[in-house]
Amino acid sequence: MLARREWMLLGLLLTAPMTAAVGNVITDWDEKAVAVVMPPTGPAGVTPVVYQAQRVMGMVHAAMFDAVNSIERRYRPYLVQLPADPATSQEAAAAAAAAGVLATIDQKTADEMKGALAAYLATIPEGKAKSDGVKLGEVVAAKIVEARANDGHDAPDAYRPRTTPGVYVPTAITAASMWPDVKPFAMTSPSQFRPNPPISLESTEWATDYNELKGYGGKTSIKRTAQQTETARFWLMAGPPAYHPFIRQLVTAKQMSVEDSAHFMTLVALGLNDALIAVFDAKYHYNFWRPITAIRNGDIDGNPATEREATWQPLDNTPMHPEYPCAHCILSGTVAGIATTVFGSADIPEIATTSTTAPGVTHRWTNMTAFAEEVANARIWAGFHYRFSTRVGTAMGQQIGDYMVKSVMQPARAAAAH
């Protein structure tokens, strides 16, 4: 828990005069990184792995933050704080750090990052400040990559379907069954925020949520409005493209300095990664059925108020992992929790973003609570999640967000001597 003096310092850091974030190196390289880990177009039939992409984003931002913070030293480091001249270029350090992490993905990306970094560095005046910044960023990137080398991200997916010998089960491979065993960036364990079990199938709440989803989440629903359908499709997008553009705009609107941008965006990037670990821990621990399974088996759940619909289908393809709790909800809850805790209010400047899954549609928000609520409703209207699961997911995310702000990269008690 932060002492009162530290919270006062954090408030001063966030309300002090800052450099406008237009063209900020942190937001620039966040955008580049998102395009690398989840390109807008890729080979036919290839689906980017959301959780792997978010892990890389966490590493990119941790490297940028520790590089910039080694120069300014206004926060405690995430992993490492290296000696650095105060005159060292923050822009060169952050760019080299981000490129250094991304270059480890594969040789093709390494070649692309070499060119991207050279182009970016060409905009920075030559001199010792620039060269020192590049060296600093490269060293920090290497240390972040080394620290995450054996975090379990590359473990094989060994999910074992529950079945009776000789009986067919759907043959598609589930997603992220190994992710509950990945080492978190900040949480003490994957199960640190594991929620209580799903509600009883015999309860009134189950019947209420079942029937809400059955009515509003079906592919041919006559209850769901055109606006609700649009919102459901808007939030079919997943991973870094769903949340990082929102955060970039928020940083810009708040006119954060380079270091405060690095701090805030690293909290979010690490928080989103740990939220995915936490939600997959809960999903595979409880192994709760998806609506398409529940509604087609509504006659065997022991609840007389849930009527079976033999041909029911969701609005879009159901994600290939257990239902409880809602993953999109824990991610939006994490973003909302971090922003609300850092800024001291859920109210924000108006932020507008588009979606890769709803071309031509723009959504706007002025409140983080409303942002998280929209995501929760979207997952119900898409036919993927029950109301109780969205509430639990959002609450988990808010807890993780609050934990991130109060547990990592806190304001330094005093400026370190250079």
Regions found by a protein language model. Name each.
Residues 8-17:
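Bacterial N-terminal signal peptides
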Residues 1-8:
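Bacterial N-terminal signal peptides that target proteins for export
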Residues 21-418:
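Acidic/polar surface patches and capping/hinge elements
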